Design a protein with these regions (language model features):
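Positively charged, low-complexity intrinsically disordered leader regions
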Residues: 1-19
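Catalytic beta/alpha-barrel core
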Residues: 138-143
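Short glycine/threonine-rich catalytic loop with a Thr-x-Gly-x-Asp
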Residues: 30-33, 37
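Long alpha-helical scaffolds
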Residues: 26-27, 40
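Histidine-anchored nucleotide/phosphate-binding helix
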Residues: 38-45
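Conserved N-terminal subdomain of the carbohydrate kinase-like
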Residues: 9, 21-24, 31, 46-136
């Protein structure tokens, strides 16, 4: 099963109180693997499948940590496109007791990679034009 799309760090600030613009309230801040493709892959792994990730991750310390987290979960990262010039993508959200207040998706590395994340489907690692991938694909609907 291929999971194509965003794999990034989710940074989530959660307050247990309602929030309005400008509020400063106590809460918890967490960081964990996330992104559409990552969330799908983690779900598939829980059902005993071994998802293959096609994505872009910065070749930096945060990216190394993210790839290690994926590997530890049993996800295949052998075909992830890594760029030493770009940082690992992140998503930051603020949530209150009433739900999402605001979020920012910094997916510039995935956007910069473009169709390079699909190279394994053409260069023989996962398929070629003559012998295309015939398995299932979960595709991040946010890709352009």
């Amino acid at each position: 099963m291929l999971c194509i799309g965003s794999v990034l760090w989710d940074v989530i600030g959660r307050a247990h109180l309602p929030m309005r613009l400008g509020n400063d309230v106590p809460g918890r801040i967490t960081r964990g693997p996330g992104g559409v493709a990552m969330n799908i892959a983690m779900g598939l792994e829980r059902f005993g499948l071994t998802p293959v990730l096609l994505t872009a991750i910065g070749q930096d310390a945060e990216g190394d940590e993210l790839v290690a987290a994926c590997d530890a979960m049993g996800l295949v990262t052998a075909h992830v496109w890594r760029d030493p010039q770009l940082p690992t993508d992140r998503y930051m959200a603020i949530e209150s007791s009433e739900g999402l207040v605001a979020a920012i998706a910094d997916a510039h590395t995935l956007e910069a990679a473009g169709d390079r994340i699909l190279a394994p489907l053409e260069d023989g690692r996962l398929g070629t034009a003559a012998a295309p991938w015939t398995g299932f694909v979960a595709l991040d609907g946010n890709l352009t």
